[in-house]
Amino acid sequence: MGQKINPNGFRLGITTDHVSHWFADSHKEGQRYADFLKEDVKIRELMTTGMERAGISKVEIERTRDRVRVDIHTARPGIVIGRRGAEADRIRGELEKLTGKQIQLNILEVKNPETDAQLVAQGVAEQLASRVAFRRAMKKAIQSAMRAGAQGIRIQCSGRLGGAEMSRSEFYREGRVPLHTLRANIDFGKFEAKTTFGRIGVKVWIYKGDLTAKELAAKEAAQPSGRGRGGERRGGGERRRRNDRAERAPRQENAGAGAETPAAAPAEGGNA
């Protein structure tokens, strides 16, 4: 299961979080769940088209009643901001035109791009599009990630590798990448390289270590859960059942004594 599923969705609520934060319960046109979802997809498509050189890792979206907050995580914030903020103003204007709401645009820098799975996948894809040998590109990215502090990394390329007529998949791995361990902090990213032979898919898994018991407890405490109340109800039920048994014991004895008395009467009548 852990080998096939997307690691981000598999660990959602444990080590990862949603990239869209909003709630939709309206049935009005333009305010339904499907409308917000389509809008999120268009916002992310707008961020990726024409911004390949910016190294955008992820786009987080948060909605309020009349405002949309967009957080852009990028390895090169200067390209996104532009000269004197011209590029940021252009992006904000396009987003306001798309959503029809006020946009709060935040541009955040990725501190360690060598251990960001999405940025590593984009870097390998750019090298493949520039006709760099795929094995060389993969091994170079692995070495950079391990030097930057990653505990394990796996890179997989799928497609017509090296211009071969039949497509295949190859992967290289270094260190540990425990895909089945839920507390493992695994970053996952994917990207497509457009080459003259067709598209080559690049997938990257980066293992950054396990969450400690204290960190897991803090995350569980932050999430609302009814387990504690349920446990108390079960405990109280057990106590009540024990008390009921203690109260029923003398009743069963009395019932037994009462049953012997009417049984003796027919016996006497029979002898008579």
Swiss-Prot record:
InterPro entries reported for this sequence: KH_dom, KH_dom-like_a/b, KH_dom_type_2, KH_sf_prok-type, Ribosomal_S3_C_sf, Ribosomal_uS3_bac-typ, Ribosomal_uS3_C, Ribosomal_uS3_CS
Matching PROSITE patterns: KH_TYPE_2, RIBOSOMAL_S3
Domain named KH type-2: residues: 43-111
Biological process terms in GO annotation: translation
UniProt keyword list: Ribonucleoprotein, Ribosomal protein, RNA-binding, rRNA-binding
Bias (Low complexity): 253-272
Keyword set includes Ribosomal protein: yes
Region (Disordered): 218-272
Highest taxon listed in the record's lineage: Bacteria
Molecular function GO labels: mRNA binding; rRNA binding; structural constituent of ribosome
Cellular component per GO, a single term: cytosolic small ribosomal subunit
Biased segments, Basic and acidic residues type: 229-238
Annotated S-S bridges: none
Pfam families assigned: KH_2, Ribosomal_S3_C
Protein family (similarity comment): Belongs to the universal ribosomal protein uS3 family.
Stated role: Binds the lower part of the 30S subunit head. Binds mRNA in the 70S ribosome, positioning it for translation.
Subunit record text: Part of the 30S ribosomal subunit. Forms a tight complex with proteins S10 and S14.
Protein name, UniProt field: Small ribosomal subunit protein uS3
Organism: Micrococcus luteus (strain ATCC 4698 / DSM 20030 / JCM 1464 / CCM 169 / CCUG 5858 / IAM 1056 / NBRC 3333 / NCIMB 9278 / NCTC 2665 / VKM Ac-2230)
Lineage per the UniProt record: Bacteria, Bacillati, Actinomycetota, Actinomycetes, Micrococcales
Annotated gene: rpsC
